[in-house]
Protein backbone atom coordinates (compact mmCIF):
# COMPACT_ATOMS: atom_id res chain seq x y z
CA UNK A 1 0.00 0.00 0.00
CA UNK A 2 1.43 3.37 -1.02
CA UNK A 3 -0.72 5.43 1.37
CA UNK A 4 -3.05 4.59 4.22
CA UNK A 5 -6.76 5.30 3.88
CA UNK A 6 -6.32 8.19 6.32
CA UNK A 7 -3.62 9.77 4.15
CA UNK A 8 -5.72 9.24 1.01
CA UNK A 9 -8.56 11.04 2.77
CA UNK A 10 -6.17 13.88 3.59
CA UNK A 11 -5.21 14.25 -0.09
CA UNK A 12 -8.90 14.18 -0.96
CA UNK A 13 -9.48 17.04 1.48
CA UNK A 14 -6.73 19.07 -0.21
CA UNK A 15 -8.21 18.42 -3.65
CA UNK A 16 -11.74 19.28 -2.48
CA UNK A 17 -10.51 22.47 -0.84
CA UNK A 18 -9.01 23.61 -4.16
CA UNK A 19 -11.57 22.37 -6.67
CA UNK A 20 -14.91 20.54 -6.82
CA UNK A 21 -13.65 18.54 -9.80
CA UNK A 22 -12.16 15.04 -9.60
CA UNK A 23 -8.42 14.52 -9.96
CA UNK A 24 -6.64 11.35 -11.04
CA UNK A 25 -3.67 10.50 -8.79
CA UNK A 26 -1.04 8.07 -10.08
CA UNK A 27 1.99 6.78 -8.18
CA UNK A 28 5.05 5.60 -10.13
CA UNK A 29 8.69 4.74 -9.52
CA UNK A 30 11.65 6.72 -10.90
CA UNK A 31 11.96 4.61 -14.04
CA UNK A 32 8.29 5.03 -14.94
CA UNK A 33 8.47 8.76 -14.22
CA UNK A 34 11.48 9.12 -16.52
CA UNK A 35 9.53 7.38 -19.30
CA UNK A 36 6.50 9.64 -18.80
CA UNK A 37 8.69 12.74 -18.67
CA UNK A 38 10.43 11.75 -21.91
CA UNK A 39 7.17 10.93 -23.68
CA UNK A 40 5.22 13.98 -22.51
CA UNK A 41 7.87 16.67 -22.04
CA UNK A 42 10.81 15.39 -24.11
CA UNK A 43 13.03 15.42 -21.01
CA UNK A 44 14.97 12.20 -20.50
CA UNK A 45 15.20 12.40 -16.73
CA UNK A 46 13.07 11.56 -13.75
CA UNK A 47 11.28 14.19 -11.69
CA UNK A 48 9.27 14.27 -8.48
CA UNK A 49 5.82 15.23 -9.77
CA UNK A 50 4.03 15.97 -13.03
CA UNK A 51 0.57 17.32 -13.67
CA UNK A 52 -1.54 16.98 -16.79
CA UNK A 53 -4.55 19.30 -16.93
CA UNK A 54 -7.52 18.38 -19.07
CA UNK A 55 -8.90 20.98 -21.39
CA UNK A 56 -11.91 22.83 -20.03
CA UNK A 57 -14.17 21.72 -22.86
CA UNK A 58 -16.56 19.83 -20.62
CA UNK A 59 -17.32 20.73 -17.01
CA UNK A 60 -18.00 17.06 -16.21
CA UNK A 61 -14.40 16.09 -16.98
CA UNK A 62 -11.87 15.73 -14.16
CA UNK A 63 -9.48 18.60 -13.53
CA UNK A 64 -6.59 16.44 -14.71
CA UNK A 65 -3.97 13.95 -13.56
CA UNK A 66 -1.20 14.14 -10.99
CA UNK A 67 1.72 11.70 -11.25
CA UNK A 68 3.98 11.36 -8.20
CA UNK A 69 7.34 9.61 -8.10
CA UNK A 70 7.33 7.61 -4.86
CA UNK A 71 11.07 6.90 -5.03
CA UNK A 72 11.98 10.59 -5.07
CA UNK A 73 9.29 11.37 -2.49
CA UNK A 74 10.89 8.90 -0.07
CA UNK A 75 14.38 10.31 -0.73
CA UNK A 76 13.31 13.94 -0.33
CA UNK A 77 11.34 13.22 2.85
CA UNK A 78 14.38 11.58 4.41
CA UNK A 79 16.67 14.39 3.25
CA UNK A 80 14.38 17.10 4.65
CA UNK A 81 13.45 15.30 7.85
CA UNK A 82 9.72 14.86 7.45
CA UNK A 83 7.46 11.92 6.65
CA UNK A 84 6.91 10.31 3.27
CA UNK A 85 3.20 11.10 3.58
CA UNK A 86 3.95 14.77 4.19
CA UNK A 87 6.18 14.85 1.12
CA UNK A 88 3.42 13.27 -0.97
CA UNK A 89 1.03 15.96 0.32
CA UNK A 90 3.47 18.75 -0.57
CA UNK A 91 3.95 17.38 -4.08
CA UNK A 92 0.20 16.98 -4.48
CA UNK A 93 -0.41 20.62 -3.53
CA UNK A 94 2.24 21.73 -6.02
CA UNK A 95 0.69 19.66 -8.81
CA UNK A 96 -2.87 20.73 -7.98
CA UNK A 97 -1.87 24.36 -8.35
CA UNK A 98 -0.44 23.60 -11.78
CA UNK A 99 -3.74 21.92 -12.72
CA UNK A 100 -5.51 25.10 -11.66
CA UNK A 101 -3.35 27.18 -13.99
CA UNK A 102 -0.58 28.43 -11.71
CA UNK A 103 2.93 28.43 -13.21
CA UNK A 104 5.88 29.30 -10.96
CA UNK A 105 8.19 29.58 -13.97
CA UNK A 106 6.19 32.44 -15.49
CA UNK A 107 4.35 34.20 -12.67
CA UNK A 108 5.46 36.84 -10.19
CA UNK A 109 5.46 34.57 -7.16
CA UNK A 110 1.71 33.95 -7.05
CA UNK A 111 2.09 30.17 -7.10
CA UNK A 112 4.69 30.18 -4.32
CA UNK A 113 2.46 32.44 -2.22
CA UNK A 114 -0.53 30.12 -2.74
CA UNK A 115 1.64 27.09 -1.85
CA UNK A 116 2.67 28.84 1.36
CA UNK A 117 -0.96 29.55 2.27
CA UNK A 118 -1.98 25.94 1.63
CA UNK A 119 0.99 24.48 3.50
CA UNK A 120 0.09 26.58 6.52
CA UNK A 121 -3.63 25.80 6.19
CA UNK A 122 -3.00 22.04 6.10
CA UNK A 123 -0.25 22.22 8.74
CA UNK A 124 2.46 20.71 6.54
CA UNK A 125 6.25 21.15 6.80
CA UNK A 126 7.54 24.32 5.20
CA UNK A 127 10.26 22.49 3.26
CA UNK A 128 8.51 23.02 -0.09
CA UNK A 129 8.68 26.77 0.46
CA UNK A 130 12.35 26.65 1.45
CA UNK A 131 13.46 24.46 -1.44
CA UNK A 132 11.45 26.36 -4.06
CA UNK A 133 13.00 29.63 -2.96
CA UNK A 134 16.36 28.05 -3.76
CA UNK A 135 15.26 27.16 -7.33
UniProtKB/Swiss-Prot annotation:
Compartments in which it is found: Cytoplasm
Keywords linked to the UniProt accession: Cytoplasm, Endonuclease, Hydrolase, Metal-binding, Nuclease, Ribosome biogenesis, rRNA processing, Zinc
GO terms classed as biological process: rRNA processing
NCBIfam families in the record: rRNA maturation RNase YbeY
Pfam name, any one: YbeY
PROSITE patterns noted in UniProt: UPF0054
Protein family per UniProt: Belongs to the endoribonuclease YbeY family.
UniProt binding sites for Zn(2+): 94, 98, 104
EC number(s) reported in the record: 3.1.-.-
Gene name linked to the record: ybeY
Molecular function terms, GO-annotated: metalloendopeptidase activity; RNA endonuclease activity; zinc ion binding
Protein's recorded name: Endoribonuclease YbeY
Superkingdom of source: Bacteria
Enzymatic class: hydrolase
Amino acid sequence: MILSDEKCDFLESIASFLSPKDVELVFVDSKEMQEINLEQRKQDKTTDVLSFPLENIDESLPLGSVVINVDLAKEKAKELGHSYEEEISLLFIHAMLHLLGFDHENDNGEMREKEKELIEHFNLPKSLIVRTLED
